[in-house]
Amino acid sequence: MNRNPDHNTFPNITLKIIETYLGRLPSVNEYHMLKLQTRNIQKITVFNKDIFVSLVKKNKKRFFSDVDTSASEIKDRILSYFSKQTQTYNIGKLFTIIELQSVLVTTYTNILGVLTIKAPNVISSKISYNVTSMEELARDMLNSMNVAVIDKAKVMGRHNVSSLVKNVNKLMEEYLRRHNKSCICYGSYSLYLINPNIRYGDIDILQTNSRTFLIDLAFLIKFITGNNIILSKIPYLRNYMVIKDENDNHIIDSFNIRQDTMNVVPKIFIDNIYIVDPTFQLLNMIKMFSQIDRLEDLSKDPEKFNARMATMLEYVRYTHGIVFDGKRNNMPMKCIIDENNRVVTVTTKDYFSFKKCLVYLDENVLSSDILDLNADTSCDFESVTNSVYLIHDNIMYTYFSNTILLSDKGKVHEISARGLCAHILLYQMLTSGAYKQCLSDLLNSMMNRDKIPIYSHTERDKKHGRHGFINIEKDIIVF
């Protein structure tokens, strides 16, 4: 029987806090379930909603000025959400409401509210790069890799983009400047800061407080537009979350990384924004070309890739003094694949102190083998490399999340061989190891190459797990 508690049964202060929050006397079950939430409930109850409404209105005026909604509508949506618990009787939903309201009252001002106050002066730090000089070289490199055969019968998943992306991008530009210790960007927008001719869609980010930021942003969009916003977590992408609207249109996504990982990611400073070092991004691009899907993307829009490649090549030429003369030495390093055990052996002794690298195509197998080695010095760089690295007895052990392309039966395609070399170089950059000679040889090994057809490719490692999501409208959190 679900009875209401009387005021003599429970401590008066706790009961009063819960009663004030719910706008009613709690049931016995509600009381016992919510009494440990009284601290959060108190913060929500005393939170100044008027100041919060003002901050959201300012955010709307600055970043969403073209969205047709009135100040009174915004206020009504905010007050409605902060009183939602009074009409909710499901304990699970009450916990969700408390958790999300707690995020708003404790973090919104410092994360998004601060974007409305006067910003520090922008420190202009751009260098003039001669990207045009690299366009022909980039085109030649990419042309030799444009070997994917498009299966016209293959059904491609559609990536629907919200009309709010341009508004969120405007907000993100300011966010990246204000929070440049905890949030950095990579991808097309970061290269646009170097070369304004680059086209970009949404802004790709790495940050240390991704979940909190995305929740705050989701509510900002909800309060301004009135739309139901959903946050999704994808199991096969590490620490990745995406915001979509009620029609499944993509708004923004983010990878979360630890602060110690953030500290070692190579980055450069442009106009008060930190971007992932384009050298590192170039290595990631070379690595990703081992993925058959990425080669299919190249086949569909080579000019998009050419603009990015030329920008990064000019950056490494200017920054590292790379000479593009075709001298490749021992690049790409020799790669031998064991297709049955799904391990590639890369001969590294010509460049590094470890004599070889065992590249696993199944992450669970690598984890098991590392345990068997009884070694505890592995480095996990999370989504930055999608892999751990371990050097033990002069052998590097690592995981490669992409496909391996074969040019013949049992023979690693040179595109994948370069991708594996790039994967090893990412580790060198992250650990401040030597990489420049290897980088020079790797880039020169991409020059003047003939197209080599793809014979076959390995399958990607299958990732398991359930999708997580936060549905604000339905008060559901599943993680």
Swiss-Prot record:
GO biological process: mRNA processing
InterPro entries, per database record: PolyA_pol_cat_Poxvir, PolyA_pol_cat_sf, PolyA_pol_nucTrfase_Poxvir, PolyA_pol_nucTrfase_sf_Poxvir, Poxvirus_polyA_pol_cat_C, Poxvirus_polyA_pol_cat_N, Poxvirus_polyA_pol_cat_N_sf
Induction note: Expressed in the early phase of the viral replicative cycle.
Reaction catalyzed: RNA(n) + ATP = RNA(n)-3'-adenine ribonucleotide + diphosphate
Residues forming the catalytic site: D202, D204
Alphabetized UniProt keyword annotations: ATP-binding, Calcium, Early protein, Metal-binding, mRNA processing, Nucleotide-binding, Transcription, Transferase
Superkingdom classification of source: Viruses
CDD domains: polyA_pol_Pox
Any one GO molecular-function label of the UniProt entry: poly(A) RNA polymerase activity
EC number of the protein: 2.7.7.19
Binding of Ca(2+) 1, residues: D202, D204
Pfam families found in the cross-reference section: Pox_polyA_pol (PF03296), Pox_polyA_pol_C (PF12629), Pox_polyA_pol_N (PF12630)
Positions annotated to bind Ca(2+) 2: D202, D204, D253
Stated role: Polymerase that creates the 3'-poly(A) tail of mRNA's.
Oligomer and partners: Heterodimer of a large (catalytic) subunit and a small (regulatory) subunit.
Record family assignment: Belongs to the poxviridae poly(A) polymerase catalytic subunit family.
Name this polypeptide is given: Poly(A) polymerase catalytic subunit
Organism: Variola virus
Upper classification of the organism: Viruses, Varidnaviria, Bamfordvirae, Nucleocytoviricota, Pokkesviricetes
